[in-house]
Amino acid sequence: MKLKLTVLLILVHASASYKPPAIEVEDYQVQEHDSIGKFVELEEHTRLILKCSAHHNGDLKYNFPSMEGNVGYDENNFKKRMEEYYDDAFGDKVLTLNDVRESDTGTYSCSSMEHSSLNDTIYVFVHRKKVFLPLKSVMIIYKQGEVMVPCKTTKFVDKSDIELYASNVLVKEASKYNYDQRYGFKITKKLYSEKQIVDVNFECRYKKEENQTATYIITEKEASSDDGYHFSWEKGFQWPHVGYNFSLTCNLNYNGSKIFHGYTNKLSIECPQCSHDPGSHVHVDRHRIIGNKISTTVRIQHLELEDSGKYTCIWEHENKETKYTDYHLYVAPKKAQIKVIETSPTIMRIKENRATSLTAKFAIYPFEKESYTAKWSRIYNSSIHEGPQSETIINDDFRKIAATSFGDGAFSENLDIKAFAVSTNMSGTYVLSISHMDTVQVVQWEVAIENDEPDVQITVREPSSFFISNQEYYKPDTNLHIECISISIPPADVVFEYKTKNSEQFQEIEPNKLVSVGGTFDRGLIYNVTFTEGMDLKCSSIRKGNRAITVNKLIKIGEGFEVRPHHEKSSKATESEPSKIIYEGDNVKLTCVFPLDSDDWSVSWRFENSKSSDISSIPTTTETEIKQYSKHLILNLRDVTTSFTGTYTCVVKNEDSEKLLETSIDVKAISKPSITGGNSNAVVIVDYDQYFEINCNMTGTPPPVYQWFKDGNPYTHGDVDGSILRVSRARGEDDGEFHCLATNRAGDKLNSIEVQVNNAPKGSLFFYWFLALLLLISIIAVFLLTCKLRASNRLTKQKDIALNTLYETMIKHQAGPLPEEMKDLPVEERTYYLPYNNDYEIDPVNLEILNPIGSGHFGVVKKGLLGMAYPKSKIESKTRLPVAVKSSTNPFNVELQKMMAEELKVMCAIPKNPNVLALIGAVTKNMRQGQLYIVTEFIDGGNLREFLQAHRNTFINELVEDEHVPVDDSYLVPNSVKKKIYKFDEKLGEGTRLLVEDPDALCTSDLLSIGLQIAKGMAWLADVPCVHRDLACRNVLITKTKIVRIADFGLSKKHTNKTYYRTKKSKDTPLPVRWMPLECIEEFKFTQKSDVWSFGICLYEIFTLGGTPYPNCDTFNVIEFIRNGNRNKQPEYCHDEIYELMKVCWQFNPKDRPTFNDCITFFENHMRDSSSQFLERVENMLHTEMQEQSKLDDWIQDSRPDVPNVSFQKSPKKQKEERYLIVESHA
């Protein structure tokens, strides 16, 4: 038994060892054809890579075609372009042929050096322009016998497209049977009718392209005396079938020059059922001699299936060797037949995204009858579904089916697959089923489509229905059917892993919990599990050492992702309102539901409608609720208006995904009830004791509630149906005026209808007494209203006098000299003594106020256009300067106007500086009518905080860790700590990254420049002196060229009252405590040193790109946090030296803090050390900005000289004035 097993193993090993090698081609489609085998087509100057692999351990070698006769072949050049080596990873012998040439066309083979019989071949076509391969010699001399006309091709062509001409005469039979793309035409005497081939011009032509020909001169040596015989079967009936009377003749022809002796030759036919008996089923005639020809015929009466087989004709000669020729007869079982003539390669291995086509040429019999039908399909095995899967192929965007008729029953079917549809999952067996009458013929192609790397997929299904859900979120105890599938040709190994929330590394799922599956183009693993906790899944596909991976996350959730709208009616709503319609004044609550399982969710709300895409444009509040497996982010919309109409999107994001959950609300505008039909005080005439109805003729939005009154009392004798009062019986008391009161949340409206009841009994005088009383009440009400209006007029007059007094004292009146004891006070604390410079006064005619661009507690800022007060030319008269126009929120509030006037006088007292917002002028003369406008520069970049936040995604960090370890290894500077240094872009040159012109770019050097500019601006204010009191990035403006302006320093004094800077825990009071030192919060003491503290906070905002100070500390705990000695941590983009400056600014004792001049010196030294050109460029830009700022006076003052030889007088302002030049602010 052991001996038998040993022998069996040896045989198995020997069988594997003697398996021939196989050639694969990289990057090109390998095709196969019945006549020439495997082949590949290339264009000239591309690269050919062949890989030869074998199962035995012997050496492999490549054999090359004979190319010496090809035009352009050079042996040395071929060797230079050719490279052979072994692939150590897989043991393959690799042949690389670079820059392939047309002359490289031919058969390449790979064989075992130990067993040369083990080999594999592939024919390589290399095409340039010519279809026929150019040869060095076109004169061919052959010996007696068959001749090859060597019209080889440089690409694979259909045989029927190549024609052979001999002396310009078409050789018709040559193309059908005797052409091979590798060698050319095989010429026999049967094909060529001339007696001898002597210096004949043969020409090969390609029918599909003009001028594609090849010409050869072929000559024949003189034939010997033994030649001249032609022995063959005569062509018989092509469609033999059961019941047909069939005959087949064998001929021997002599065309030689000698005398033919027929008696020396004998022909006979042999077959299993052959007989010389005339009555037999298969009868063979005796041979007949006619001239130089001998023939014998086999005759079969009523063909049967058993007559199929080999029929042999035997030629016997006295002086020659006996010769044989065979004819293979196939008897079809039916008359209707289909024969496949030619197909495109039936085994195909191609690359993805390369167009391909499948073609079959066939003939049908009898073709006079009904035509054929054809059906294309694809059969493949799926790793998911059991059994073979079939797909019927039709014409669509990916595949095209075409049919061609050649006549005489010959046809072709073609399936073209477009390049973008050629993917690995389209592999399989492609089947063409041809039906003709009662016969079916099937042609198959095995198509394997290789991909560069496996396509790995994780699919989650519900097991009972196999419905693909592929969601991330599932409720606990859900049964899941999870597939890890790799779509790959060649096949790849699959690994399925998982990781729970509590584990750090992925680990393989236990094999006994997995089911292995496979198909034509895919392999995979199936994991059936009951979902209990969140997990990460990883599916890996490994092929030739390369790994493709996909990861999926399954999260536990109690509720699905959704937005739930909830609608609460206004307290003013009436019971008649439709419950589902949202009206102005209602409250809406939008609840965004998302998972609790993960902590890295970022959830926010977006809002969009036709007018706005910013949710800050509408007042909202948010709150968060935590459920068992979910979180709820609730957006509260209170007292909604039509501006709330739009789409609300809850944006739920984490590192891997983003979900947009949308809902829309439509807020209907409300309108007070109004009369819509008929007239007020209409008259309705009714008959006593009869039915009548009256219509209120009023409507509103929402639909109002209707109440009816008669003689001042509610009317209770009828039924109210909407706006109609239905009365079943008219009474005498119904005579008179009815009142209808329509009420909704927008208000109410009263309408009166007079009802006249005919034939009613006379009533009492009570009604007239009631009218008299009503008239008396009306007179009293008019008297009271008159008194109230007179009181209101007195109040308005008092405000008018107060505003005029304010103007006289604050603007027009110039106070005396400043007392000595007040000279050291900040400028904002001595505003009474500050003069208002009338040179700043702007004529309202020159100022056009546009849309609002910002607002605060006390003032509102609008964009404006300023015209020149004293233009020197027509162009200047039509030029407009964009400006910012500030006014109070209530122009008739004396206290607010006083604050505005004080701010104006403070700004007048501060000289222009490129880092301080400049005053252009003001409108003060109409303060009595509420017109007090402060006109400043228009800064196009907005406030600094929003600017920094907007550039977070595009920020360029120029701060890196120093790779050099410091020498000093003290406890202050340990070697383990690496310092941060600047690394500016070397391509741009040193320091040139500063203030780049691209507004979308922001880098570390820009942050340094911004910090220096704020220090310069605050130092300028400190020299006035002026204490800002509210320095923060929100109060710093920035231009698109990254020049900053300190703003809102004029109103700072008004915040010293304790209603603004109190520390009471009230969320309704704005408290900038995150920017203030303790002495400001607790003692309300504001100095330049408190501004320095705020400057340090500003630096923190800058280097966190708009971050909030003390981010992990609640607002109400900030004071205690600071008091305990805690400070902000060092920002990521902040240099160590900058952070040291911040900490000095945050010293508890104000005396220990630096001055702003100290801060300027620090920044200049720091920037100078970082870059030799850095500081210089900043100073140059600020100098240019100062020059531009000084030109602002030209817009309101007559300080410029007239234009020479130009006389111009400003025309009166028109209602519609042409403005063809708008000058943007230099900022």
UniProtKB/Swiss-Prot annotation:
<keyword id="KW-0547">Nucleotide-binding</keyword>
<keyword id="KW-0812">Transmembrane</keyword>
<feature type="disulfide bond">
    <location>
        <begin position="592"/>
        <end position="650"/>
    </location>
</feature>
<dbReference type="InterPro" id="IPR003598">
    <property type="entry name" value="Ig_sub2"/>
</dbReference>
<feature type="domain" description="Ig-like C2-type 1">
    <location>
        <begin position="20"/>
        <end position="110"/>
    </location>
</feature>
<dbReference type="InterPro" id="IPR013783">
    <property type="entry name" value="Ig-like_fold"/>
</dbReference>
<comment type="function">
    <text>Receptor tyrosine kinase which may be involved, downstream of pvf-1, in the positioning of ray 1, the most anterior ray sensillum in the male tail.</text>
</comment>
<feature type="disulfide bond">
    <location>
        <begin position="696"/>
        <end position="740"/>
    </location>
</feature>
<feature type="active site" description="Proton acceptor">
    <location>
        <position position="1030"/>
    </location>
</feature>
<dbReference type="Pfam" id="PF13927">
    <property type="entry name" value="Ig_3"/>
</dbReference>
<keyword id="KW-0829">Tyrosine-protein kinase</keyword>
<dbReference type="GO" id="GO:0004714">
    <property type="term" value="F:transmembrane receptor protein tyrosine kinase activity"/>
</dbReference>
<feature type="domain" description="Ig-like C2-type 4">
    <location>
        <begin position="673"/>
        <end position="758"/>
    </location>
</feature>
<keyword id="KW-0675">Receptor</keyword>
<dbReference type="GO" id="GO:0005886">
    <property type="term" value="C:plasma membrane"/>
</dbReference>
<keyword id="KW-0732">Signal</keyword>
<feature type="glycosylation site" description="N-linked (GlcNAc...) asparagine">
    <location>
        <position position="245"/>
    </location>
</feature>
<feature type="topological domain" description="Extracellular">
    <location>
        <begin position="18"/>
        <end position="764"/>
    </location>
</feature>
<feature type="compositionally biased region" description="Basic and acidic residues">
    <location>
        <begin position="1214"/>
        <end position="1227"/>
    </location>
</feature>
<feature type="glycosylation site" description="N-linked (GlcNAc...) asparagine">
    <location>
        <position position="528"/>
    </location>
</feature>
<feature type="transmembrane region" description="Helical">
    <location>
        <begin position="765"/>
        <end position="785"/>
    </location>
</feature>
<protein>
    <recommendedName>
        <fullName>Tyrosine-protein kinase receptor ver-3</fullName>
        <ecNumber>2.7.10.1</ecNumber>
    </recommendedName>
</protein>
<feature type="disulfide bond">
    <location>
        <begin position="52"/>
        <end position="110"/>
    </location>
</feature>
<keyword id="KW-0472">Membrane</keyword>
<dbReference type="GO" id="GO:0005524">
    <property type="term" value="F:ATP binding"/>
</dbReference>
<dbReference type="InterPro" id="IPR020635">
    <property type="entry name" value="Tyr_kinase_cat_dom"/>
</dbReference>
<keyword id="KW-0808">Transferase</keyword>
<dbReference type="InterPro" id="IPR003599">
    <property type="entry name" value="Ig_sub"/>
</dbReference>
<keyword id="KW-1015">Disulfide bond</keyword>
<keyword id="KW-0325">Glycoprotein</keyword>
<feature type="domain" description="Ig-like C2-type 3">
    <location>
        <begin position="565"/>
        <end position="666"/>
    </location>
</feature>
<feature type="disulfide bond">
    <location>
        <begin position="204"/>
        <end position="313"/>
    </location>
</feature>
<dbReference type="InterPro" id="IPR017441">
    <property type="entry name" value="Protein_kinase_ATP_BS"/>
</dbReference>
<feature type="glycosylation site" description="N-linked (GlcNAc...) asparagine">
    <location>
        <position position="255"/>
    </location>
</feature>
<feature type="topological domain" description="Cytoplasmic">
    <location>
        <begin position="786"/>
        <end position="1227"/>
    </location>
</feature>
<keyword id="KW-0067">ATP-binding</keyword>
<dbReference type="InterPro" id="IPR008266">
    <property type="entry name" value="Tyr_kinase_AS"/>
</dbReference>
<feature type="domain" description="Protein kinase">
    <location>
        <begin position="847"/>
        <end position="1175"/>
    </location>
</feature>
<keyword id="KW-0677">Repeat</keyword>
<feature type="glycosylation site" description="N-linked (GlcNAc...) asparagine">
    <location>
        <position position="425"/>
    </location>
</feature>
<dbReference type="InterPro" id="IPR050122">
    <property type="entry name" value="RTK"/>
</dbReference>
<dbReference type="InterPro" id="IPR001245">
    <property type="entry name" value="Ser-Thr/Tyr_kinase_cat_dom"/>
</dbReference>
